[in-house]
Regions:
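Accessory terminal regions of nucleic-acid processing enzymes
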Residues: 1-310
Length: 310
């Protein structure tokens, strides 16, 4: 691998722009369909767009702020010294592959990926497990670096520090590289988007692309009539299954009667009373319009409906 550019004096905008020039570690899981928070469809639109999006949230902020601490805990636990990479790296054999490494292991052909994890996601790391999109990220780093192994240290808030060592598996890396290069060659380069997979990320991206509507236009959907038929078939099946599910729940309730809880091997059932207060918005708008307007806001969205005309 080679150092593409130092990140020591690189602005956040330039850093993001360089990442558009190839596939990075955080792209890998999305391209493979393994990332629950990002899709290949989103990666595609990020790569072809000239817009630099500064996406950030509290979890990402904490991850950055605590990276030093996780690296320090890793050194304490393993005795391995680490150093900052301070660069965007590029695979010499596969120039499309780029990487930003959290840390490199001193004196070894190895690196370290630091993660911070909510305690609510601790089960995803239980019993030696590693989330699939993080495995893809680490394997991407192994592909770029040509190193022998990579460590991943995950700090689960309030619980523990989990450390795993992932060794190079040539078959896995070759498959990953092939998938990434296929994505770039057949999607990004010709600007042909991958087919949406039904993920929440795909929905967000599509809604962002087409947030406004033209009510003077009607699209001819005859070419995808088969998709509409398939959707209707699925809707009918879902409706039937929902009814069957509700019938089962009704039988369970009849069995429980006034019991708040029920048990069966492998199951815990609860049927408990709860109270909640809800604002009567219509009455508030009528009787206190000033207060209603003061605390109301306009939310713009496009409502999507399909009506089947038999």
């Amino acid at each position: 691998m080679k150092r593409l550019i130092s990140t020591l004096n690189l602005s956040k905008e330039d850093w993001l722009r360089y990442r558009k020039c190839g596939i990075t570690g955080t792209d890998a899981g999305a391209i493979l369909g393994l990332n629950p928070y990002r899709s290949a469809f989103q990666v595609y639109h990020d790569k072809i767009s000239d817009t630099i999006e500064h996406i950030d949230n509290e979890a990402m902020r904490q991850g950055r702020d605590l990276e030093d601490y996780v690296a320090q805990r890793f050194t304490e636990a393993t005795g391995l010294k680490v150093r900052r990479a301070n660069a965007i790296y590029q695979s010499e054999e596969h120039p499309l592959l780029l990487a930003d490494f959290d840390r490199l292991i001193v004196g070894q052909k190895a690196g370290l990926e630091c993660k911070t994890v909510s305690p609510f996601s601790a089960d995803k790391w239980a019993d030696g497990k590693i989330p699939a999109h993080y495995m893809a990220q680490v394997n991407h780093y192994l592909a770029v670096s040509g190193f022998d192994c990579w460590y991943i240290a995950a700090l689960i808030f309030g619980k523990e520090l989990v450390i795993h060592k992932i060794t190079t598996d040539k078959e896995v890396l070759n498959n990953l590289i092939a998938r990434e290069e296929h994505f770039w060659k057949y999607n990004v380069m010709p600007e042909i988007p991958p087919v949406p997979t039904g993920s929440e990320g795909d929905t967000q991206q599509i809604n962002q692309l087409y947030s406004a509507d033209d009510r003077n236009k009607t699209a001819d959907l005859n070419s995808i009539r088969d998709l509409l038929d398939k959707r209707q078939e699925l809707s009918d099946q879902i409706e039937q299954m929902e009814q069957e599910k509700m019938a089962i729940e009704q039988q369970v309730k009849l069995q429980m009667q006034d019991a708040a809880y029920g048990t069966a091997p492998g199951y815990k059932v609860s049927w408990v009373s709860s109270e909640s207060k809800r604002v009567d918005s219509q009455r508030l708008k009528k009787e206190q319009p000033d207060i209603f307007n003061r605390y109301s806001k306009n939310v713009r969205s496009r409502r999507f409906t399909i009506i089947h005309a038999a």
